[in-house]
Each structure stands twice: as C-alpha cells, then as structure tokens.
C-alpha cells in the first residue's frame, strides 16, 4: 500500500484500495456470466433498464447493478473482440463511472475501458456522450466498440463535422476477424449507416468530437422549430484525451457566426502597407504574448501611405484595427507553422496537435489579413451569433469524466475548474522504457545533423524510430537532412487522420523511420513488429531495443512531451526516448537564459556536438513551468469572464427554449406584459398598443397570429443577443484600461455587463412590439405572414474558432471594426425608424431595425 501511495499519490492509492472489493465481485461473477448464451445479453440489458425505470433512487440502483453490468461488458468484449478487460482496466472504468479522470499510460486500452461506464450509464435512457479529438477516432471507436454495445442490445450513434452522422449498422454481416485485427487504425465503413443528427443523439451511446457537441448546442439555440432540435440533454460524458480538450483548447471559444464585414480590397490595401513596415523600427513584436505594437515611426509611415493626417481621429480610427491586424498577420503568423494554404484556402494548424483544422477561422479580421497576405480568396468577416467555451459547455453535464495518458501534471487545474480528481491507474505490466536525458546543441542546424546521424545508426540496427516535431515546417526540414544521410522514412503532416492512423500503426516495424508532428496518430497503438503483429518481427524489434522515440524540440507543455515519450514502451515492451534540443529552439530562444549561450560559446563547443548539463535541463523545465503557469492564468482569466457571459447565456437560452415550447396561454401572457409595460409608462400609449395587437390578430386569425408572435420573439431574441455579444466583446476589450483608475476589470465587466443585459431585456419587448406592428397578411403564394419591408431572416452560419483577447487594445476598436460613429444608447436612432405606438423615432437601444442593412448603412462615416 505504501508503495502505491508513493507511486500514485494518496488520492489515487485510496481510490484503488477502495475498488478492490468491487473488482473482486466482478471477477466472482465471471464464471456465471460466461455460461450465458449470446441471446441472454440483450435480455439482461432490458432487465437492468426495467429496474432503473422503476427505481425511486436511480443512483443507488446503478451502484447495485454495477458489478454484473461490468462483468457483462467484459464477457461481451471477449466474445466479440477477443479481448478481456484486465483488473486495472476495471479500476479505470470505476474511476470514470465515479466522475473522475483516469490517467492510463499509452497502450493500456483506454478505448476498451470506456465501454464499462458507457454501458452502465446508458441503461438510464438519458444517453452517454463519448468525446474524441477528431472525426476519424469517433468513427473508428464506434465501429470497434459498437460490436460490444450491439451485442448487449444498445444502439450507437456518431456525429461528425459537416453535419454528417451515422448509426452503427448491426444488420451488416461479414466475417469480422480482419476488422478485429486492423480495426485500431482502419475503419470498416459498412458498419456505419448514414442517419440524421437527431437519430445519432437519440442512440444510447453517441461518439463525436468536442467541437461538434459544442456547435450542436449553439445551433440548437438558434432553431425556430422544436423539430429542428438535435440534442436531448447533457447526462454523462466521457472525454477521451481529456487534457487536450479540457485544457489545451480551453482558451479557444466556440463561435457560431453570420457573415458581415469589410470588402476584400480593404485587407489587400493594408497588407501592402504592412509589407513596407520594418520590424523593430516601425513595430515591435512580443513573442511571448504573440502580440505587436506600432511605434511612432510606424504610425507616421502608415499615415503617409494611407494619405491620412492622423489615424487616431474619428475619421481615421477605423484604420487602426486593420493596420494592427495586417502587421500581426505579417509578423506573428507563419505559414506551415500556424497555418497552411490548401486548395486556395488558409487552414489553421492546431498548435498542440499539429493537425489541420478546416472550417475554423480566426476572428477579429486576422483570418482575412492572412488570406490577403497569401493571395487567396478573402472571405467576409463574421459576427458572433452565439459562443461558448469548452470550460462552460462541459460543466453542463450532470456527470463528467475523462481519460488520458498525461493528466497528473495538470491535476490542480482539473480540480479547480471542473471539480475532477485525477486517478493514476497502475499499468498492467511494469514500464521498462528508458528515458534518456536531453542532448543540447548550440544551433538548430547542428541538432538536425546529429539527429540524422543517430537515426541512421538506429536504422542500420533495425530499430524503429518515431521522430516528433512541433510543426509541419520542421517535419519537412528534417526530412531533407535524413535524405542526405540516405535514410528512407515516412512523413506525417497530420493532413489526413485516417491515413495517418494506418501509417502510425506500422511505425513499430523493423527499420521503420516515421517523422510526425508531436500529436499525429494520437489514439493509435504502435505495436512492435507492425500491426497486426508478426511474431518473428516482434521478437527481432524487441531484441533491437524496441521503439526509439526521438523528440526534436521541447514543447511549451510538459504533458505534450510526456505524450510523445508514451508512444514507446506500451504493455511492458522495450523502448527508449530522448529529446534533442538547441538554443535556437523557440522555447529556449524566448524563455531561455543568455548565460547558456555565452557558456557554450566560451568553451568553443562545435555546433553538432551535444552537451548534457543539469543546469540547462533545469532551465528548460523552468521555462516550461513558466509557460504552463502563464497559460493556466490565461485560462482562469478566460473562465472568469465567460462565467459572466454564461449566466446571461443560460437565461437567454432557457427563455428561448421556453418560447419554442410555449402554448397559447404563455404567448398571450407575453403580449399582456408588453401592453402592461406601455400602460405603466402612459395609459394612452398602452391603449394604442392594445389596438395594434388586436388589429393584427383579426387580420391573421388567432392561431396564425400567435405563431407569428412566437417567430418574432425568437427572431428578436437572436438579433438582440447577437448585438449584446458584440457589445460585451467590446466591453471586454476596454475594461482592462480601467485598472489604471484603480478599478478591478472583472468587477467593472460584471457591473456594466449586467446593466447592458437589463437594457437588452427591456429592448426585447420594444422590438417584439415594433415587429408585430410591421406584420402583413400572407400573399396567395405564402403560407405564413411576413414582416413588412423584411424578408424572413436568413443566417449563414460560419463555424469559427477564435483566440481570446487577453491583452486588449482601446475601446475605440469597437468603432473601428464597423466604421460607425458612436451613438448614445438613448439618442434617436440614425436609421429614422418610427415607433408606431408613439409616432417618434426609436431610441437607438430600442430600435426594431437594429440589425437591418439600412440601419447599419446610416451609421457609416
């Protein structure tokens, strides 16, 4: 026990000790369960479901069912996959069921572990969501594990991007021995039947990516009919690669948007100007914060090129944002590191995984500025119609759990943000991998030369080598060095997940050399000798030392380095790992010490000769710890602000859902509250409002009128919420400046945000009444009434992924973005729209046409 405590920490050792009795119960049931006929398994599932449906205390009943349910899943896996859950995998499953994070090393069978709690929690008929990092893994896991669930009588759905959804097709029959051998990396699509999004969510267990779950939630809060809702609540989630999803992507909000913005000529013009500005003279770059600041000389030069006397006046302020964005695109964002150009489009590269992220776009005009820089088609800027961070989305679940190979280093954050304990699960077999100390070189060139020589040596011995790089650019550069040494190799640039899976699965073959971005092929086991295993090849590679993992650069997060190391030494196999780093690497260059460079220069060490030095290793670790702390603070800061928005978001979305489901009485109550509000202000105005409403009701008929009011409320809610999101975004950009006046930015954000939210609620009733006044009778070709002067609102939804604004500029950016003059919220609206109840021009904050094109045009300088 003391050994476990020392190895896995008190919390983990306590949990493991407490599960011993349950694991013993599951094992004791094995003989009885193995005696069951295949047809008995779905019957058992129906029996469990029946017990739960009749239970007054479902949680207790679930715990009573647990040992038998886990034993059933274990036997189903044996019969369908030829795999039996180890005892440590049962412990991992118990941790997930308890709403904790299971840290399980690579190769310990996390995908199989998830079947245990997924089956148990799906019995309650509220659904289980299993979250993966990409579409490929969602499909792969559904096909492989679908055999188990189907055997037990459960249905399985898959949600993928581009609104593609599947159900596991139990009717497809074939000899599936090959599927069990290659299913870890190759998907047999015959087992996936295309279906609707709703049907995929209605399945007992649904596989999908974190982005799709989040976007579907946002889309569900934009629908105008109950029939269009797809999600059915947030019951239990198992997050695979939980550190990647809940930590690495935590600062990146999901945004669903509609198109808006400046013409592409604007972006091209500012790109031409940015090209003529010189670094350190006209602008400065902060590499740690990935930010730029214009110098006085740069501003003067830009003003001259623009032909503007002063860009910080009311007429010129709109140029500031475009200028800063163009310079940032030029100086901070690098092709083949931050993005690639593919098929005439700028595609973002995930900084943690190296994977391409098609469909996602940077906001604030950054993406458009990069498109101008690369000479591809410039898409329009977007306006946010809804947004949420992963931090707040995943906190919707009644029970949340996760699994990964590397969670312990972030245990504090998991506990503070999500209330999740990390349980370190022992490996089934001892890890015998050798982790060598880092080799440090003076230059990147010297480092790559040394790597090429080392790989050649290992290659001649028959040792398979997996080389991890941090970017596509470094992948291709290292490939040149290996070609010079005559080493045959495969490059993985994370451009095709499925192909990537097939290649990485063979990285353990004799003499195989694979260069991959650090996270490529995550979720795929690398088996010595290849996959499927050939015994002679396995024995040869094992004798040659197993898989050698060579890291070419330290990542900002220690977890990513540990994940790369974890590719070697699975299930007690031989293996070795080592990092080759140089003083020119980004981590050392930006955060490292000048003393190291001076020391290596003083001793005259050749550039391709390494040194092993404790001081330098400590400097590396210190730099990583600094960055991790910096990112933790940034994520905490993001969450503090999003918590304010989350409270408002819940109110708006709950009210919207209520209106979707509202009956006649509830809609009548809303109309009455509008009339009452007007009467309180002015009895004559209230009477006029009542007349207008009754007049429209008579024209349309009671039923059609109330349905039109429902649509108006939904539309007005969406329009005002979009405006409110924009206003809150601008508020966020400006509150940091209030710190100079000894005021706490987050307190100011909460206070002003609440005032703006109350104004929005007040404006909603005004706008609903205003739009009711514009209702006209339907034409002969139309089935429903329409609003005068307006078409049915259309929305082009653009999936967007935006970086948060941690270090914001001045509040004038709000003006600069749209090129609008500032108008007081209580001023008459410049669009001139007349309030039919009063005969006067609407106040700006209450204007019923606030999002109409004529409204926006009238505000342009």
Residue ranges and their predicted role:
Residues 277, 539-694, 704-705, 725:
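C-terminal helicase module of SF1/SF2 nucleic-acid helicases/translocases
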Residues 66-74, 96, 206, 294-296, ...:
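Core structural elements
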Residues 626, 651, 655-861:
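Acidic/negatively charged segments and metal-coordination signatures
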Residues 20, 27, 459, 628, ...:
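Short amphipathic alpha-helical segments with heptad-repeat character
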Residues 22, 29, 36, 44, ...:
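Heptad-repeat coiled-coil/leucine-zipper interface motif in alpha-helices
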Residues 1-604, 654:
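Conserved P-loop NTPase motor core
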Residues 160, 421-424, 612, 617-628, ...:
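Long, non-coiled-coil amphipathic alpha-helical linker/lever segments
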Residues 11-14, 61, 608-611, 615, ...:
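Non-transmembrane, amphipathic alpha-helical segments
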